[in-house]
Amino acid sequence: MDVTAKYELIGLMAYPIRHSLSPEMQNKALEKAGLPFTYMAFEVDNDSFPGAIEGLKALKMRGTGVSMPNKQLACEYVDELTPAAKLVGAINTIVNDDGYLRGYNTDGTGHIRAIKESGFDIKGKTMVLLGAGGASTAIGAQGAIEGLKEIKLFNRRDEFFDKALAFAQRVNENTDCVVTDTDLADQQAFAEALASADILTNGTKVGMKPFENESLVNDISLLHPGLLVTECVYNPHMTKLLQQAQQAGCKTIDGYGMLLWQGAEQFTLWTGKDFPLEYVKQVMGFGA
């Protein structure tokens, strides 16, 4: 790719950042489409995020992706949020229109699209959702919008717990989906929830390198063959949770699906063009 002064810059702001496949994926897509943009990753944490946003405006960047730990904080630094992003309380995409920043969340649409592409109909189904950060809440919100009957959130009683309760209340008030939030330490409640669930989704970073030997499911017998197990983590490709699920006879969807579909939507938001989906699947080796 020959980058010239006519190229516009798109970023990714996250910490840590080196594990991300987004720069490779987006740059391959941009080059294939022949578009005058380049995508770069920037190591940005909560403390440096405000300054990074000022830099985005000053450099007239087209926009940026936002990942952990900045997804919720980023809502405070945009001029407009989509209705879905308001429901989530977190964004993963910022589009810069001449200094006016719009915030979107494509995590939820990406993950639900990956589930649908597998042939699974979520309408009327029950999901057990692990975590209450930006990815989890995005998936929960989009799932509720698209027809999930019930979402059972399980997360540790940490700094996200009160935010999870507030998220559950927003979804309950604005959709027909029933959302509950339970401390993950309550393993009896967790076991009972899994027994009647249709989908188990890991929206946490548990299982991501260098913690690839970890899983929030401590007992593989809690997983049953009728359960669809989906993952947000894609590094490693086969997380411990997915290994457990396959051993238990569950159908699984890896983190590449969410990465691909959320990235496709981001691409269109930034460029106004269609994402070269089949090409990217081939060159990135996603295969699904």
Swiss-Prot record:
Its EC number is 1.1.1.282. NAD(+) binds at A132, G133, G134, A135, N155, R156, R157, D158, K205, C232, V233, Y234, N235, G255. It catalyses: L-quinate + NAD(+) = 3-dehydroquinate + NADH + H(+); L-quinate + NADP(+) = 3-dehydroquinate + NADPH + H(+); shikimate + NADP(+) = 3-dehydroshikimate + NADPH + H(+); shikimate + NAD(+) = 3-dehydroshikimate + NADH + H(+). Gene3D superfamilies: Leucine Dehydrogenase, chain A, domain 1, NAD(P)-binding Rossmann-like Domain. Keywords: Amino-acid biosynthesis, Aromatic amino acid biosynthesis, NAD, NADP, Oxidoreductase. InterPro entries: Aminoacid_DH-like_N_sf, NAD(P)-bd_dom_sf, Quinate/Shikimate_DH, SDH_C, Shikimate_DH-bd_N, Shikimate_DH_fam. Pathway: Metabolic intermediate biosynthesis; chorismate biosynthesis; chorismate from D-erythrose 4-phosphate and phosphoenolpyruvate: step 4/7. Substrate binds at K71, D107. It holds the Pfam family SDH_C. GO terms for biological process: amino acid biosynthetic process; aromatic amino acid family biosynthetic process; chorismate biosynthetic process; shikimate metabolic process. GO terms for molecular function: quinate 3-dehydrogenase (NAD+) activity; quinate 3-dehydrogenase (NADP+) activity; shikimate 3-dehydrogenase (NAD+) activity; shikimate 3-dehydrogenase (NADP+) activity. CDD domains: NAD_bind_Shikimate_DH (cd01065). It is an enzyme of class 1 (oxidoreductase). Homodimer. PANTHER family: BIFUNCTIONAL 3-DEHYDROQUINATE DEHYDRATASE_SHIKIMATE DEHYDROGENASE, CHLOROPLASTIC, SHIKIMATE DEHYDROGENASE. The actual biological function of YdiB remains unclear, nor is it known whether 3-dehydroshikimate or quinate represents the natural substrate. Catalyzes the reversible NAD-dependent reduction of both 3-dehydroshikimate (DHSA) and 3-dehydroquinate to yield shikimate (SA) and quinate, respectively. It can use both NAD or NADP for catalysis, however it has higher catalytic efficiency with NAD. Belongs to the shikimate dehydrogenase family. This is Quinate/shikimate dehydrogenase.
